[in-house]
From Swiss-Prot:
This is Elongation factor Ts. Pfam families: EF_TS. HAMAP family: EF_Ts. Residues 80-83 are annotated as: Involved in Mg(2+) ion dislocation from EF-Tu. Its main location: cytoplasm. GO terms for molecular function: translation elongation factor activity. Associates with the EF-Tu.GDP complex and induces the exchange of GDP to GTP. It remains bound to the aminoacyl-tRNA.EF-Tu.GTP complex up to the GTP hydrolysis stage on the ribosome. The keyword Glycoprotein does not apply. It is found in: Cytoplasm. It comes from Zymomonas mobilis subsp. mobilis (strain ATCC 31821 / ZM4 / CP4). InterPro entries: EF-Ts_dimer_sf, Transl_elong_EFTs/EF1B, Transl_elong_EFTs/EF1B_dimer, Transl_elong_Ts_CS, UBA-like_sf.
Length: 307
């Protein structure tokens, strides 16, 4: 059996909100596997569902930029939050976000693209690392485009114009007036930032994630002792709830707390007299899925001193 450390118990407790002894038992049951321990706690009703695995612990910035009917979003990571406040770093993120519009979202291609300052993006990044004195890295990028309509950007927790901690793009396909679409898109983008949808619609949700929810619901329902047909209904109800809560078009609009996003779009289309399609969205949260390595500062000092 794997050794269960205090750090692992602490990490599981922070992630799930479950009690310390429950977290220790879950890790024992899961042989030290964090994801399996989360599932065990949820199956026992001891932890709330987490839409995203892992803590958001990496630093840096997310940038967004629009050019006509195209929009780009980029995440650049750094070691500390101090770098995110550095104007040179902010300008770098903005500049490379603009290059996504031209060269696309593939990070390898982007790294080799020519930078306005001279050399490649990677050359400028390397120079910045030397100047600022801290490691930095391009993590991910996305590009949205529509033929007719708008791509609307939104930055949450803005650090400087166009860069912040959460970046969202919303693509609306329509021949409705652009100012009308931009207003609608801004509201939907703010919703996306707050509601963290995992997919545009229920059919687009990750099959493995849905089946994981089904397995957790099955185990939880089976422990209720109810007849098999009721257990089946409980499981299907839980899966349906998961789908509605995680698909953007099925979510309840955070602005009014009662209307589904799909109905918000339909109502807007009727208002303007032109069909409107919510084509796509992208949401980047800084450090999503990355855990920063925790270190013992005293041990680091001792190691550096050769103690």
């Amino acid at each position: 059996m794997a050794e269960i450390t205090a750090a692992a118990v602490k990490a599981l407790r922070e992630r799930t909100g479950a009690g310390m002894m429950d977290c220790k038992k879950a890790l024992n049951e899961a042989n030290g596997e964090m994801e399996a321990a989360v599932d065990w706690l949820r199956a026992k009703g001891l932890a709330a569902a987490a839409k995203k695995s892992g803590r958001q612990a990496a630093e840096g910035l997310v940038g967004v930029m629009i050019d006509g009917t195209k929009g780009a979003v980029l995440e650049v990571n750094s070691e500390t939050d101090f770098v995110a406040k550095n104007e040179k770093f902010q300008d770098f993120v903005k500049g490379v976000t603009a290059l996504v519009l031209e060269h696309g979202s593939d990070i390898d291609t982007l790294s080799k693209a020519p930078h306005p300052a001279g050399g490649s993006v990677n050359d400028v990044l390397t120079a910045n690392i030397a100047t600022i004195g801290e490691n930095q890295a391009l993590r991910r990028a996305a590009l949205l485009e529509v033929e007719n309509g708008v791509v609307v950007p939104y930055i949450h927790n803005q650090v400087a114009p166009g860069v912040g901690k959460i970046g969202v793009l919303v693509a609306l396909e329509s021949e409705a007036p652009s100012d009308f679409l931009e207003s609608l898109g801004k509201q939907i983008a703010m919703h996306v930032a707050a509601a963290t949808p995992l997919a545009l619609d229920e059919d687009s949700l990750d099959d493995a994630a849905v089946e994981r929810e089904r397995a957790i619901a099955q185990e939880k329902a089976a422990e209720s002792g109810k007849p098999a047909e009721i257990v089946t209904r409980m499981v299907e109800g839980a899966v349906a709830k998961y789908r509605k809560e995680n698909a953007l078009l099925s979510q309840i609009f955070v602005v009014d707390g009662k209307t589904r996003v799909s109905d918000v779009v339909s109502k807007a289309a009727k208002e303007t007299g032109k069909p409107i399609t919510l084509k796509q969205f992208v949401r980047f949260q800084l450090g999503e899925g990355i855990e920063k390595q925790e270190t013992d500062f005293a041990a680091e000092v001792a190691a550096a001193a050769g103690v």
